[in-house]
Amino acid sequence: MFKAIVSADTLGAALDSVSVLVDECKVRLDEEGLTIRAVDPANVGMVDLELSASAFESYETDGGVIGVNLDRLEDIVGMADSGQLVHLDLDEETRKLHISLDGLEYTLALIDPDSIRQEPDLPDLDLSSEIVIEGADIDRAVTAADMVSDHIALGVDPDAEEFYVDAEGDTDDVHLELDREDLIDLTPGEARSLFSLDYLKDMNKAIPKDAEVTMELGEEFPVKMHFDFAEGDGHVTYMLAPRIQSD
Amino acid sequence: MFKAIVSADTLGAALDSVSVLVDECKVRLDEEGLTIRAVDPANVGMVDLELSASAFESYETDGGVIGVNLDRLEDIVGMADSGQLVHLDLDEETRKLHISLDGLEYTLALIDPDSIRQEPDLPDLDLSSEIVIEGADIDRAVTAADMVSDHIALGVDPDAEEFYVDAEGDTDDVHLELDREDLIDLTPGEARSLFSLDYLKDMNKAIPKDAEVTMELGEEFPVKMHFDFAEGDGHVTYMLAPRIQSD
Amino acid sequence: MFKAIVSADTLGAALDSVSVLVDECKVRLDEEGLTIRAVDPANVGMVDLELSASAFESYETDGGVIGVNLDRLEDIVGMADSGQLVHLDLDEETRKLHISLDGLEYTLALIDPDSIRQEPDLPDLDLSSEIVIEGADIDRAVTAADMVSDHIALGVDPDAEEFYVDAEGDTDDVHLELDREDLIDLTPGEARSLFSLDYLKDMNKAIPKDAEVTMELGEEFPVKMHFDFAEGDGHVTYMLAPRIQSD
C-alpha cells in the first residue's frame, strides 16, 4: 500500500536528482519516507535520495519496493503548475501507479524491481577535507572546466586554507580558488582527486544554484556531495569515483 | 479590388489557425469580410475561418478569390511589433499582394487559386453533445495524451454529466474527467469518438489558452471545435474526422 | 607587457563585432588602446575595431601584437555576469593570456600572429552618400530581405532624398524607403550598390539595435558602416565589397 500527496515541485526535484544518473530506479517505501539509491551503468556515479514523510502533504504506506521509469514520471510531474499537488496511489494487484493532478489521471506501469540494476552501497569513507559551498560556485567551476577539458581536479590546500578546482586542456587551463571568505565553511586537510567532468556536469544539473552543498574530499578518493531540498525534508548524496591521475 | 488595414495580431492569429493544417489556401474576399476554408491533404482535418470586415481598421473589396502561400505571409506579418498595423493592397493585374508595415513593403506573388486543393464542404452534422471548455484544458488533455499514445478518445458520459478524455498506450494510460464545475457549459448526450492525436495537436497550437472553445461530439462522428478571436470579429471552426475504433 | 581591467560587457561587445567575420585575429596593443583589423577569408567583409584605453578600468601596455582565438575568449567573457570586471594579464614568456573574473582564472594559449591572415588596409573611399540610421532599421531591412533573396541593394535617391533597400527574389520582392524623417541624418548623392546578404546579416548581428550607424554608400562601391559602443570609447567600422549587378 502506498498513497501520498506531494507538491509537484518537491517530487520533481527529487526525481531530477536521480534521473541525471539513471533512467530506471527502485523506490523504497517505508513509514519514514521514500528512498532511492542508484548507480550509473559504469559504476562511477552514485546517488542516495531521501524524501521524508514530512515532505508530503499526506503519506501512507505499509512498505515495499517499486520500479519506476524516471523519464515517464518526470514528464507527468512536469505537467503540473508550480505549487500544484500530485496524488500518488499504488495499485498492488496490477502493479500500476495512479498519478493524478488537477483532474488528470495517469496510470503508470511499474517495472519489475528485480529487472533493475542492484542498489549500490555507499561506502562510509573517512575523507580528510570538508567544504561547504554554494551550488552556484560548483556550476561556475564545472562550466569553466568544460571549456578546456573533460576532467577536473578538486582539491584543498590546507596551508593556504583554500578549496581549488583545476582543469587542464591541451592548450588552455582553468583554475578557481575559493578561500574561507568565498566558502560557507571549510575543514581543510590534504586532498586532491581527479574526476570525469561528464558525471560532475550531470550532478551539477540537479544541484540548486542556491543550495548549500557539503563536499567531502580526499587524496585520490571519491568525492561526496550532499545537499537538502524541500526545506530540509529532502536530502541528496552524490558520490563520484575518482579517475586515475595521468601524471 | 482589395485594400485593407488590419492589426498584425489579428491577421497573425487568423493565418495561424489555417497554417496548422495546410501550406497554401484560397482566401475568399467579399464585403462582409474574408473567409478561408481548407482541408489537409489526407482529408482528415478541416478549417473554416471567418474574419469579418469589422476586424479591420479599414476594408474595401469588390470580391474575389486569391491563392496564398501561408508560410510567406506569416513570416512577413511576424516581422511586425504587437499592435502594429499591416496594409494589404491587391494588384489585380500582376496578381501580387502588396503588404506594407511601418515603411517596409513586401510584394507577395499570389498562387493561382485553381492550383490549390478544392475547398471542402463542412457537413452540417447533428451531434449529440456540446461542451464549452477553456483552451487551456484542451492543451492539458492533448499534452498528457501525447505522452502515451498517438490517438485520443473524446467522450461524454450523460449520466455522470462529464466530458472525458482517454488515451491508451502500450503500458500507460491517461484519463481526464471534467464535470459541469470544470467546464464552462455542457449539453450532455451519448458521445465517444477516437481521433488522431497529430491533428488535434496541430489544431491545439492555434487555439488560444484563454479561448472559450465550443466542442460538438457524437458517437463515432467527427468533432467540431469553434472559437472566436479578435474580440469576436474572427471565428474559427475546426472539424476532425474520427479514426475507426480498434476494439 | 599588457595588463588591463575591463567590464565584461565592453570586452564582449568588442569581440562580437570581430567574431562575426573571423575566428582568429591579431590584437594590436599600444598606449592609446587596442585595435583589431580583420578580413574574412573571401576578402569581402572587413572590420576595424578600436577600443581606447579610456574604455578600460585600468590599462597598461608597452605595445605589441597578440594572436587570439575569438571563440575561446568570447566563451570565457560570456561566463561573467553583466557589469562584472575581467582582468587580463599577458605572460610574454609563455605567450599565454591570463584572464580572471570573480576568482576564476583562465589561461588562454595565444596564437602565433604570423600564422593569422594579414590585416587588411581599409581603403579611404570617397563615397557620395552618407546615411545615419538606427541599428534597429538595419535589422528590419536585413530580416525582410532575407525572406526573399540572398542579396540586397542599398541606395539613395537624391531627388526624393530617400535611402532605400531593395531585395528581389524569384517571386517576391522587398522594398524599404526611409526619408529624412525616418533617418537620423542624410547627406544624399547618387548611390546604389548590391551586396551579399550573408555578410550583412553577420555584421547586423554585432550592431546594437539602439546604435546610431553611419553608412557611406556609392555607385557600385563598397559600403562602410561605423558605430560607437562602450559610451563612445569603442568604435567599429565595417566595410563590405559590392557584388556585381546582374542586370
UniProtKB/Swiss-Prot annotation, chains A, B, C:
Keywords, alphabetical: DNA replication, DNA-binding
InterPro entries the UniProt entry points to: DNA_clamp_sf, Pr_cel_nuc_antig, Pr_cel_nuc_antig_C, Pr_cel_nuc_antig_CS, Pr_cel_nuc_antig_N
Single Gene Ontology MF annotation: DNA binding
Keyword DNA-binding found: yes
Pfam families, alphabetized: PCNA_C, PCNA_N
Taxonomic superkingdom: Archaea
GO biological process, one term: leading strand elongation
Keyword Protein biosynthesis on entry: no
Function: Sliding clamp subunit that acts as a moving platform for DNA processing. Responsible for tethering the catalytic subunit of DNA polymerase and other proteins to DNA during high-speed replication.
UniProt xrefs under PANTHER family: PROLIFERATING CELL NUCLEAR ANTIGEN (PTHR11352:SF0)
Quaternary data: Homotrimer. The subunits circularize to form a toroid; DNA passes through its center. Replication factor C (RFC) is required to load the toroid on the DNA.
Family designation: Belongs to the PCNA family.
Protein's name according to its UniProt entry: DNA polymerase sliding clamp
Gene label: pcn
